[in-house]
């Protein structure tokens, strides 16, 4: 059994779409940076799936691959950021300047998602070393939450790449569902501990994984909202104040 079943293609360290050696118009360069960001996001998403699967398979080769890909993601983070800094020095239309500003934030969020995949692999190593296992229900719960997180991540990346706000409300709804799912799973895991149905160590790792997945969803939401050049938490706070004043 595995927790995620999407294809896990190979990845390469070298950037595919951006290069300071090839001259292109600034607007084309911005589009290429977006394509490189999409590639980096696919790497991070695939690596998260790979890492989650190692919780079940304990496959050391796959765990090693998670760490290798994380290095690639960090490499791309630096390369794209440097490229954007270089682009920012050109004379650009306001729309491109805003797009570059948003890309800085998006690339950082993707890098943070990559960090969570590495944390999951660390948990798989800990579970292997300490002979810790989850119940079948625990595995199912993680798999279902992972599916929700992948959905919001896919939609957010697509939204940003297309610069399309059409599905923003759907992103907000999925994010709210994931927040509720995290609360429900944390409560269920406390109940399992109380009934002695799982060990304290398994419970602690499970709790960390659920919290980590919720934070991945937060980063995905940030990516969607970056189109507006607005932080989702700041927006929620502003709307709450506006609602209270009505």
PLM segments and residue spans:
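Cytosolic, long alpha-helical scaffolding segments
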Residues: 5-246
